[in-house]
């Protein structure tokens, strides 16, 4: 050992820190449940976010989930067929829905904290058909005039593409099963369940990919 070499010297990690892994962006998985397909006229009803964390070994894992049910914004429509698919009961006594501004504050706060924790510049939305989620999110942000949206306004990581490349599957349920993840069809179309499963899928694919060093 050389005279000036620290006794506890460790080899340099063979992976990039989160702040550099995705050009300064922190992946955050988002899923929304809505009153239809048109973000300009249909209501946002549920949202969930899961920041992606990085362990000491450089492997990714899902962080804590933040979620909210939303009161439909005034003037927006809800297609009854969408409620049949999601199973959302708008007047359920335990739905505890928040107004859009309050709901966005609730889910954005832990995202901003995770961005700061990893020294990233901002969050980048990860989703399955990600621009659907981003468009509804951006529409809600615009409606309430939210000034602290942590997400990139148009860039995304789409697990449809990632799963298509990795497993040859583009449907979330089939992609999750191809990745060796459990899938419960009864829980699907809940923003929390779909977000958490998408986060697991993203981590499975990202951890299998030899990232830049």
From Swiss-Prot:
Q: Which organism is it from?
A: Xanthomonas axonopodis pv. citri (strain 306)
The residues annotated as site (Important for substrate binding and specificity) are: 37, 132, 154
Q: What is the lineage of its organism?
A: Bacteria, Pseudomonadati, Pseudomonadota, Gammaproteobacteria, Lysobacterales
Residue numbers binding Mg(2+) 2: 31, 33, 189, 194
Q: How does it assemble?
A: Homodimer.
Pfam families annotated for this entry? RNase_T (PF00929)
Q: Which InterPro entries match?
A: Exonuclease_RNaseT/DNA_pol3, RNase_T, RNaseH-like_sf, RNaseH_sf
What protein is this chain from?
Ribonuclease T
Function comment:
Trims short 3' overhangs of a variety of RNA species, leaving a one or two nucleotide 3' overhang. Responsible for the end-turnover of tRNA: specifically removes the terminal AMP residue from uncharged tRNA (tRNA-C-C-A). Also appears to be involved in tRNA biosynthesis.
GO CC, sorted alphabetically, is: cytosol
Enzyme Commission number(s): 3.1.13.-
């Amino acid at each position: 050992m050389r005279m000036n070499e620290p006794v506890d010297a460790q080899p340099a990690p063979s992976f990039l820190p989160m702040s550099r892994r995705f050009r300064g962006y922190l992946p955050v998985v988002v899923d929304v449940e809505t009153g239809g397909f048109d973000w300009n006229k249909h209501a946002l009803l549920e949202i969930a976010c899961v920041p992606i964390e990085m362990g000491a070994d450089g492997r990714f894992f899902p962080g804590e989930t933040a979620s909210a049910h939303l009161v439909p914004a005034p003037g927006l429509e809800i297609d009854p067929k969408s409620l049949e698919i999601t199973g959302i009961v708008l007047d359920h006594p335990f739905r505890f829905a928040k107004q859009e501004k309050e709901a966005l504050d609730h889910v954005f706060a832990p995202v901003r904290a995770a961005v700061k924790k990893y020294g990233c510049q901002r969050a980048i939305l990860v989703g399955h058909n990600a621009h659907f989620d981003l468009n509804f999110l951006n529409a809600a942000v615009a409606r309430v005039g939210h000034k602290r949206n942590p997400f990139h306004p148009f860039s995304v990581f789409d697990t449809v593409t990632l799963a298509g490349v990795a497993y040859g599957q583009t449907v979330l349920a089939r992609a999750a099963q191809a990745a060796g993840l459990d899938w419960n069809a009864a829980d699907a179309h809940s923003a929390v369940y779909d977000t958490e499963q998408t986060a697991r899928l993203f981590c499975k694919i990202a951890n299998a990919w030899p990232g830049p060093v």
